[in-house]
């Protein structure tokens, strides 16, 4: 439909699954872009995602955990920022109101995206994950994926990597509601 519209980026929680797109929040009133993070089509049969989750993408959050540049989340964060670029390139986008939302892993990606891109004007982060991983050392609960509970005490490279992608470090950079 002709006109200029606000936009909404939806980033996913953890897992490997299909996405149908958000056609229900504000149909005809907002541009919505819902993205996956794994670089695979989001419209395949559930059995394909189940096989990937149990195989090639099993524990994807640990991939490259010895280097912030090789970390799985490096590509994921860049992808979220590129999604903002794409929205901003649309002639239908009003150039004023751009939100990002997600829960758990998506909540973390919402915070990170809003902290890194000033074009994001609002966010809705629902129980963001990837937070305060070092709470493990203080015998406190930490955020998903609980790296050190399941994988043991980290070496210095792993610790540096999880610190780099810790949502708490991005939250302090937020300038949007």
Predicted regions and their residues:
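Short beta-strand element of the alpha/beta-hydrolase
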Residues: 3-14
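Short beta->alpha connector loops
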Residues: 13-16, 104
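Active-site loop signature of alpha/beta-hydrolase-fold enzymes
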Residues: 16-17, 40, 131
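Cap/lid segment of the alpha/beta-hydrolase catalytic domain
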Residues: 23-24, 29-78, 135-142
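Short, structured coil segments at secondary-structure junctions
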Residues: 27-28, 119, 174
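Primarily recognizes the serine-hydrolase "nucleophile elbow" in alpha/beta-hydrolase
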Residues: 82-141
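The feature captures the conserved acid-bearing segment of alpha/beta-hydrolase catalytic domains
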Residues: 138-177
């Amino acid at each position: 439909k002709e006109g200029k519209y606000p936009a909404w980026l939806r980033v996913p929680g953890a897992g490997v699954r299909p996405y149908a797109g958000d056609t229900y929040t504000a149909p005809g009133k907002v541009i919505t872009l819902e993205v996956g993070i794994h670089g695979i089509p989001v419209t395949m049969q559930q059995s394909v995602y189940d096989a990937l989750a149990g195989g090639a993408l099993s524990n994807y959050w640990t991939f490259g955990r010895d280097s912030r540049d090789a970390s799985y989340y490096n590509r994921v964060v860049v992808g979220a920022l590129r999604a903002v670029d794409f929205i901003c390139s649309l002639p239908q986008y009003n150039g004023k109101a751009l939100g990002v939302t997600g829960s758990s892993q998506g909540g973390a990606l919402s915070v990170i995206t809003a902290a890194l891109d000033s074009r994001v004007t609002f966010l809705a982060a629902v129980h963001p994950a990837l937070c305060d991983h070092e709470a493990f050392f203080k015998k406190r609960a930490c955020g998903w994926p609980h790296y050190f509970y399941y994988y043991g005490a980290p070496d210095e490279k792993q610790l540096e990597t999880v610190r780099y992608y810790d949502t708490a470090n991005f939250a302090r950079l937020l300038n949007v509601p």
